[in-house]
Regions:
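Conserved cytochrome P450 K-helix E-x-x-R motif and the immediately C-terminal K′/meander segment
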Residues: 29-53, 223, 227, 310-351
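Conserved cytochrome P450 K-helix/beta-meander segment immediately N-terminal to the heme-binding cysteine loop
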Residues: 363-391
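Cytochrome P450 I-helix active-site segment
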Residues: 15-25, 127, 131, 182-187, ...
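N-terminal membrane-proximal hinge/A-helix region immediately C-terminal to the signal-anchor transmembrane segment
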Residues: 2-105, 109, 128-136, 175, ...
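Cytochrome P450 catalytic-core helices
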Residues: 277-296, 300-302, 413-428
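Cytochrome P450 heme-thiolate monooxygenase catalytic core
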Residues: 6-20, 82-88, 122-280, 298
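Cytochrome P450 proximal C-terminal region
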Residues: 2-12, 41, 134, 138, ...
Length: 474
């Protein structure tokens, strides 16, 4: 890809990089190899066009993309389509029986216990910490020479770690953050192999690359979080943070509190899943705005009108409409969790297809968000899709970056508020430009990330030589 002229790009439709699907379903050996490279490469072209695609395998899978059918799986008959056991097999060593990996009553009481902590009124109290996370990145960029290139994906991971340290674990969070940074990369590298083995139902004892590293970090990370919980229990200081609220949370029906092991399970889930999803959402959004200066100008103009000269606060979040439009379109094109799976607990009929018990059901969020029957010009970056007056133009089951139904990500609202506050803070402070001749490649590693990172040139607004968009004008 040649360098794009910003002025020309503002009037030219933007079609950012996408995964090219195979024209036909893959046979087992090729499917296995492609899955290891990028699980999205195993979703055939038909899934982007048809409401239901049945693959007899091996491996056998039913891809469900029609919103009405998705609703059946996730809501109407959700008991017939429980969470696929492979998630527990792959992630259970780290996350145990958390709200992410548990099922049935075990999931229900945890959800009831934790849900009050993620209501909107509770979330906005943490906006200052979210802004501080963005400002930590701005501080680092300001210290660099003007126009320096930065690894935005790594910077956003650091910034969202900062948010964790100031919302979930003030005081002890910095140490855990450093440990997480060391362990996450090794752990994520082994995920593809362990998932592929689980899909093929290979024995758990069979050697695989990364297995030893994953086991080490499962033990290490769980021990660090358990120690932190014990320290907080014995600390005489008063804390007003998400961690303390989680320790004191009770099931409204039974008055039951979480035992230490479940606290470890859920804290690790929030720590890892929470910050990675927001970090990658910001990474892709900053890239898209670097390629769409017309939308960058609109976003900047709104930020300056709504926020003015002070910091972003909780009162600003709902008024940053254009910022949220851009974020939603980024989440559509690059959903942080690009694929969900369920399985059939019994024989079921779906869209005229008889599906036997034990069949893997694929909910390819990435493909649903780019489905040719559901979206006009689906691969185009167009935030106007999410304008307030067009909210009734799409189903809640065709846009679901955080899932849908009872099992929707419990931290979805927190993530959206965090992304809004941080993006507004970042865009007001800096301009981003993509100078790479190579497009970023979306690859699924639990979350959707750029395969080789996301280098962007960062120029602080107001510095000499930075006239572009200095007043919110293209």
């Amino acid at each position: 890809m040649s360098e794009i002229c910003p002025i020309a790009a503002s009037s030219v439709p933007l079609y950012p990089p996408r995964v090219t699907p195979p024209p036909k379903p893959l046979h087992l050996p090729e499917s296995f190899v492609k899955f290891l490279r990028n699980p999205l490469l195993t979703i055939p072209e038909a899934v982007y066009h048809e409401p239901l695609v049945v693959l007899r395998g091996p491996p056998a899978i039913v891809w469900v993309t029609d919103p009405a059918l998705v609703k059946i799986v996730l809501v109407d008959q959700c008991d017939d389509f429980p969470q696929d056991p492979l998630l527990r097999r792959v992630l259970g060593g780290l996350f145990g029986n958390s709200i992410l990996t548990s099922e049935g009553r075990d999931w229900r009481w945890q959800h009831q216990t934790v849900a009050p902590l993620f209501r909107h009124g509770e979330i906005v109290r943490y906006v200052p910490a979210m802004v501080a996370g963005a400002e930590s990145a701005i501080k680092a960029w300001s210290a660099a020479p003007p126009g320096s290139s930065h690894a935005i994906d790594a910077d956003m991971l650091r910034a969202t770690y900062h948010v964790i340290c100031n919302t979930l674990l003030p005081g002890g969070g910095a140490f855990i953050g450093e440990t997480m940074k060391q362990g996450t990369s090794d752990y994520m590298e082994g995920i593809s192999w362990s998932t592929a083995y689980a899909v093929l139902n290979l024995p758990v004892w069979l050697p695989r690359p990364g297995r030893r590293r994953m086991r080490f970090w499962e033990t290490r990370l769980r021990a660090v979080v358990a120690d932190t919980i014990r320290e907080r229990h014995t600390s005489p200081d008063d804390h007003d943070d998400l961690f303390t609220r989680l320790l004191g949370a009770v099931d409204p029906e039974t008055g039951r509190r979480m035992p230490e092991e479940r606290l470890v399970d859920n804290l690790l889930t929030f720590l890892l899943a929470g910050h990675h999803t927001v970090a990658m959402t910001l990474t892709w959004t900053l890239y898209l705005l670097s390629r769409a200066p017309n939308w960058e100008a609109r976003v900047l103009d709104e930020i300056r009108q709504v926020v003015a000269s002070g910091p972003v606060t909780g009162e600003h979040i709902d008024r940053l409409v254009t910022v949220q439009q851009v974020l939603n379109e980024s989440l559509r094109l690059y959903p942080p969790l690009p694929m969900m799976t369920r399985y059939t607990a019994k024989d079921v009929d779906l869209a005229g297809e008889h599906i036997k018990a034990g069949t893997l059901i694929g909910l390819p969020i990435y493909a649903i968000h780019r489905h040719h029957r559901l979206w006009d010009d689906p691969d185009r970056f167009d935030p106007s899709r999410f304008a307030p007056e067009r909210k009734t133009g799409y189903s809640r089951y065709q846009f679901m970056p955080f899932g849908a139904g009872p099992r929707i990500c419990i931290g979805a609202a927190f993530a959206l508020v965090e992304a809004t506050a941080m993006l507004a803070t970042l865009i007001r402070a800096a301009r981003f430009e993509s100078l790479s001749v190579q497009e970023p490649i979306p690859v699924s590693r639990v979350v959707l990330r750029p395969k080789d990172g996301m280098p962007l040139q960062v120029t602080m607004r107001g510095r000499a030589g930075d006239d572009s968009l200095a007043s919110g004008q293209p």
